[in-house]
Amino acid sequence: MADGKDSLRLAPDEFKQLEVLRNRFHQLTHSLNSLFNDIQRSQPLPSQESLTASAAILQKSLETIQKLADENSDLFQRIVVHPSTNFPGRTQEHILLQLLRKKLEPEVESWVEDARSVAKASGLDPSKLASSQQRSNDYDDDDDDYRDEEEDAPSDPFNEQWADMFQVSMDSIRDYLMNQANEPYTIAEREMGIENVRTGLKRSLEEEDSEEEDEDEDEDEDRSLATAGLGNINAANLFHPEHVLWLASRGNMKVPKNVDLEAIRKREKPRGRPAPAQ
């Protein structure tokens, strides 16, 4: 095999990156072998803390390798492995075949197929991922002047899927906060009929909700009148920290009546105790 950076026609910095990646792969292989030996020899199996620590080390190694591969993708795609005339092909044939292999090994191929099956079962189309990755890499030379710095970074084919999942999650959370959080009955209870739900209460939950809404409206009017009596206050000052905190936690600004507004509580005159009867 051709040795050194001269045979590969690499710059010193490029050869250094290649050496760093080789060392990272060596560390990853060592960590995998160490974990495999620990599991094989330990009776009983290693503790949960030990397995978690090993998994964290492996994940960190994989992230580092992925980052190096992304940062030097052009370099690694340009490098071509070719045997030199003095390579011991007879005694090191297995290494030569491993380096020159263009297809995945059967075991690795089975892992890839399993991953594709899991992705398909989850609603992800592997062919769509591959096509999106191909489209992201197919840039014309004229497009380079119009690309942002973020577009120059290596693209992830799962970005669109993660964005879709994030949007669905946010929509579900928003629907729950706005429509379901204050709902006294579940969807299943609504479907079977709320008259068949045993709440253990003498009054209907629907009636209680309507009464609470009326009380909230009355209290809001009282608060607005109390606030108006304190001077000329614009509409922006009618929002208190309690409203903001409630909006952040529940998705609406309907503060319950049992929550006192600190600003109004401080401004209102405390009610004194009645004088004792003579």
UniProtKB/Swiss-Prot annotation:
Main location: nucleus
Coiled-coil features, chain-numbered ranges: none
Region (Disordered) residue spans: 122-161, 201-224, 257-278
Family indicated by similarity: Belongs to the Mediator complex subunit 8 family.
InterPro entries: Mediatior_Med8_fun/met
Keyword terms, alphabetized: Activator, Nucleus, Transcription, Transcription regulation
Quaternary context: Component of the Mediator complex.
Sequence ranges of Acidic residues compositional bias: 139-154, 206-222
Biological classification of the source: Eukaryota, Fungi, Dikarya, Ascomycota, Pezizomycotina
One cellular component (GO) term of this entry: mediator complex
Record's function text: Component of the Mediator complex, a coactivator involved in the regulated transcription of nearly all RNA polymerase II-dependent genes. Mediator functions as a bridge to convey information from gene-specific regulatory proteins to the basal RNA polymerase II transcription machinery. Mediator is recruited to promoters by direct interactions with regulatory proteins and serves as a scaffold for the assembly of a functional preinitiation complex with RNA polymerase II and the general transcription factors.
Compartments, as annotated in UniProt: Nucleus
Signal peptide: none
Biological processes, Gene Ontology terms: regulation of transcription by RNA polymerase II
Molecular function GO terms recorded: RNA polymerase II cis-regulatory region sequence-specific DNA binding; transcription coregulator activity
Protein name, as recorded: Mediator of RNA polymerase II transcription subunit 8
